[in-house]
Amino acid sequence: MTIKKEPVDVVIVGFGWAGSLMAMELASTGLKIVALERGEQRDTYPDFAYPRIVDELTYGVRLKLFQNISKESVTVRHTTKDTALPYRRMGSFLPGDGVGGAGVHWNGLLWRPLEADLRLKTVVTEKYGASFIPGDMTLQDYPFTYSEMEPYFDKFERICGASGQAGNLNGERIDGGNPFEAQRANPFPTKPLLYQYSAMLFEKTAKEMGYNPFPGPAAICTEAYTNPYGVALGVCNYCGFCEKFGCYNYSKASPQTTIIPALRQYDNFELRCKSHVLRVNKDSSGKLATGVTYIDENGREVEQPASVVILSAFQLHNVRLLLLSKIGQPYNPETGEGVVGKNYAYQMLGGAKLFFNEKTWFNHFAATGASGAYIDNYNSENFDHAGVGFIGGSTVSAHVTGGRPIEQTVTPKSAPKWGTGWKKAIRDSYLHNMSIGVSSSVMPYKQCYLDLDPTYKDGYGLPLLRMTFDWQQNELRMTQFMAGKTESMVTPVFATPILTTSWLA
């Protein structure tokens, strides 16, 4: 028998970044708010306390902070002609689980969009003509401009205690910042993260080649700081355990370090963990949400009536809940009609790994998730695309996140894969390598979308989300272009000898 709770004003589904921000902003209005999080309760202490959290096997390899994909996953296929199969082993994307969601285990990279990013279809059409856009690319402008969003970008940076160097402050170009960034109203709340030696080498090379290097924008605090909610953050100690880990030092911004301590003060807010939402309920017209139905920690079905329902789970789960609840028109790739599940896109990563001799040392273990030197010269519309044959672009960086022994130990391609020779290669290369990373955009296509799988179901008997996605020629051309640009930086411009390099795509 379904348990029916007392109605509330607002129910929030998913309690990561979006859910906690919505709860905080609404709590001050006096509305009665309930947040439902399907994972467990987690806080900086005791869950992320040192030394527990710096356990690479538990958190980095066994992925303790992530969704249990044995109970719910997505199915994946490349084209509509393929049979989708379940995503059984975490790899490319890592949905979080528990309070804080993916906002706990992220690296803290805190980029604003460029002005062109939000009106890319218009910009591309005006510069190169409508025929420059491939026929299967469903490029669209966003329904808002950068100037409309800037106050909210600014507020979130202040909530996070973000670190970085402004490059365009109220229209004034600032040396040392990103010269391509859109205008910002205020400087970063805290100073940039320190460079590792690899970033220093990259910065020197980039300047000599005519590029414009700058420190990466990060949701990682570099000074003692109290945010607008009255929550104090600590100073980063460069421990090298950001991605896949919670921050024990109160330095990396997360819901736990920036919002939840202030939110706890409101009696009109309630958080229920281990509450797995199955669907959004609607009235008889099918046009008005009336609440949600979820399974509680004791396995009971519960109905929570609410005047307002906010879906703030991981993006894949929001789409699935809309489809399961029959809200909105599902996207149809054959006709182009519908919006739910349309325009699924991802990102493309690559880079060059550089190995040096014993005279050049890199202490990668002193790192953060977002420190490093970057260039934006080949990002978005910051360069002329007329002769390159693709839309989009990349940031290029010397960005080191740590020197952890299991996941972040690298050897040259020529090294043995096991045994004494492998051990020697580890000793020879651990402190004598660096990488140049490339993070690239991916455009939307009519054949890349999300819908419900007709075969596979989750532990509650509901269809899994099906992902149809593959790399397209536009992105493959971009990757080859960026490989050439990146490898051109790996030259004698570096003052120290480079033994080998390898392109990783």
Predicted regions and their residues:
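A short, basic/flexible loop-to-alpha-helix module at the beginning of a structural domain
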Residues: 1-7
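A glycine-rich dinucleotide-binding beta-alpha-beta segment and adjacent secondary-structure elements
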Residues: 7, 216-220, 238, 273, ...
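N-terminal Rossmann-like FAD-binding beta1-loop-alpha1 element of flavoenzymes
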Residues: 9-35
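Residue-level detector of alpha-helix initiation sites
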Residues: 12, 16-17, 193, 197, ...
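Glycine-rich loop(s) and the adjacent beta-strand/alpha-helix scaffold that form part
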Residues: 28, 32-34, 39-56, 249, ...
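Conserved N-terminal glycine-rich FAD pyrophosphate-binding loop of Rossmann-like flavoproteins
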Residues: 40-65, 96-108
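Conserved redox-cofactor binding core of oxidoreductases
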Residues: 59-61, 65-76, 85-92, 123-125, ...
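FAD cofactor-binding and catalytic pocket of flavoenzymes
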Residues: 78-106, 112-113, 117-126, 133, ...
